[in-house]
Regions:
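Long, well-ordered alpha-helical scaffolding segments within enzyme catalytic domains
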Residues: 107-131, 181-188
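C-terminal helix-cap and adjacent tail motif
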Residues: 5-7, 11-12, 19-33, 159-192
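Divalent metal-coordination and catalytic microenvironments
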Residues: 53, 80, 96, 114, ...
Length: 192
């Protein structure tokens, strides 16, 4: 086993303690589309929606599906969803309602609405979760890191002093201190 001045070094495949994350199995196996308890009616889907896209599903769903889909906010042109595989606690996705993968396809009013959503939700998170900063990002295309290249979405990643600890470095894992459902409750309460 390799060691460092700070102890054993994490090596892929070595016998280590395990952190169980059973909610990731469907994603890893490619079968997790975030289906709500009740299907979204076909007539609710927007034109050109991708029925396999969780952001299109969130855009088409009614408020009764918001909790199970992680939707914390909507406007006439956008939807705000909790990232189910977050980089940090409070990681949100801000997406246009329509399924499109390029900025060129967005109208000026959509761009303005998306930017206003980023401002609003940074403020909500800062107040509700006392975050000290944010990383905001947009990955355009699969080679740029987009996990859903067909549906634009901005990441809001809250940050705190000392929020990255030894776990990612030594064990290759991140520890998130709050369940996604508790986060949904906290953020929706903060916007009431």
């Amino acid at each position: 086993m390799a060691t460092t001045p700070f102890g054993p070094r994490y090596t892929a495949g070595m016998d280590t303690e395990r952190l169980w994350a059973p909610w990731r199995l469907g994603y890893v196996q490619g079968r997790d589309a975030g289906d709500p308890a009740e299907p979204v009616p076909v007539d609710a889907w927007r034109p050109a929606a991708d029925c396999d896209c969780f952001l299109c599903r969130a855009a088409a769903a009614t408020p009764k599906h918001d909790r199970i889909l992680g939707v914390v906010g909507r406007t006439e042109r956008s939807v705000v969803v909790i990232n189910r595989f977050p980089y940090s606690n409070g990681h949100l996705l801000v997406a246009p309602l329509d399924h499109r993968g390029t900025l060129a396809g967005l109208a000026d009013d959509e761009l303005l609405d998306l930017q206003r959503c980023l401002v609003r939700w940074c403020d909500v998170i800062a107040r509700a979760m006392e975050s000290e900063g944010f990383n905001l990002g947009l990955n355009l295309g699969r080679v740029a890191g987009a996990g859903v290249p067909g549906h634009l979405h901005w990441h809001i990643v809250p940050r705190w002093a000392g929020d990255v600890n030894f776990m990612p470095t030594t064990a290759g894992v991140r520890v998130l201190p709050q369940s996604l459902d508790d986060l949904w409750l906290q953020l929706t309460e903060a916007t009431r």
